[in-house]
Amino acid sequence: MESLVSVCAQKLVCDHSSLRRALDLMPKELYPALFKAAFLGKKTLVLQDLVQTWPFAVLSFHKLLNSNRHCDPQLATEKPSKLCVQTVILGVITYLSDALTKGPEGPQAGRQRLRLLDMTGMQEEGLEQNPDTMSLWSRTVTLAKACIDVSKRHSEEVMQVSKRRRSCHINALPASSPLYIEVRVDLFVNSTSYGVLREALLVSSHSPLRLQCRDFRAEELSLRSTAGLLELLNPGSVRQIDLRFNNLGLSGLNVLLPHMAKFSHLQSLKLPYSNVDVRRLSPVMEEGLQSFASQLGQLGALKELNLGSSRLSGRLRQLLGGLQRPLESLELAFCSLLPMDLSYLSQSSHMSSLRKLDLSGNNLSEFLLTPFLHLLAEISGHLLYLDVMECKLADAHLSALMPILCRCSWLRYLGLFCNPISSDGLRMVLQNLVRLPELHLVVYPFPVDCYSDPTHFSSTAASLDSSFDHEKLTRVGEELQQMLVRAQRMDMVWTTDMYVQRTLDSLSL
């Protein structure tokens, strides 16, 4: 049920002219509720007025939009409106321009000055882009251009003021503390946006609008460009670095890791699709692997590591043994792991802290099954997220897997997509998993008996679209939903959408 504050805020933002006249008399405690109502209601004129008169030092999207205190929490799950995000950015720029031009007599006189715009933690797009929402890449480009524009205009204004003073023979005034707004943001860059982001980061340190990166993601970017951007990031603000599809190889990773050592708060390092294969190393490459492991060990705050799609057969002990602290999240999808790798994990210090584990794409049906079950038993008391997509797990393995999986009492997410499990197998899995009180999302595979030709089951997700008996598949889905109703677990989502968990921030688990 919505609160009275929420209902009143929604009514107020519908009357822009009246609200604008009343803003000077409005208690500052109402601003968060008004902002949320205006943002979710797409009241852009109201949003701009609220931002330009914001009475607090911090304006945080995540805290304002995800608070359940003032508005319907169901609305907060919607993806942010592109127009509303642009409006807030424009409002901050206008606010800053007025403050720089008018100084202490400007519109913020008597109010606490806005110092931080926090745009981190916003809902991200799924697989399909919605033209009415704003992707992380688009937000990055928009903010970069805004930073450059504000910096240029400020420099021009400073030069004009200086010229006027010289022409009037007025001595320079004592330097005052610079007025600026810090923008805490997650950045996503590729070769298309590299130039504008680099320019923005270069001017950011002395611009009135200063970018502070929390999570940095780069795709399909050259080694030199990636290293250059890492050098421009604030060492104290970076929490996550995600480099993917960059074809870096061991040599490239060893060039970049020294640039990361300065990030004292770096908790997450994601290096999927880095073209690393340790199965046949030359002596020089062996030295490179040892250097890579040694430099990983220098990242003292690291608690999340993704080495997906690198062939790491038999080398987990070497790579993870030197880390300064146990990992809480480990993603090893399609890493060609051996039994000795999983046995090492079961005995390592990481075993006591792992909350997220992704072993997708490793064949758990044969030699890896026993060490996998042993590892799962060891981490069952604190595991929150398990992804075993495309691991060749079939009905024959469920009798061994289910008893251990049911011990994972804190499990929130389970990924079983693209495993050759039958409809009967899925029913058995559901009957067991409804006992787990924290489990709210299961991504299950298309049952093998729903294929037009079950003998030609494919483990490749891209080939699954056209080979089903769609009527049978629909019936199975409906039956699973009915089972959830009978078990009184309507809070649990069972889906075949493998992208549904894309927006999950594992650092917030």
From Swiss-Prot:
One Gene Ontology cellular component: cytoplasm
Annotated compartments: Cytoplasm
LRR repeats: 111-146, 210-234, 235-262, 263-298, 299-323, 324-355, 356-374, 380-407, 408-432
Natural source organism: Xenopus laevis (African clawed frog)
PROSITE patterns recorded: LRR
Keyword entries, A-Z: Cytoplasm, Leucine-rich repeat, Repeat
SUPFAM superfamilies: RNI-like (SSF52047)
Protein known as: Leucine-rich repeat-containing protein 14
Pfam families with a match to the protein in the record: LRR_6 (PF13516)
Family: Belongs to the PRAME family. LRRC14 subfamily.
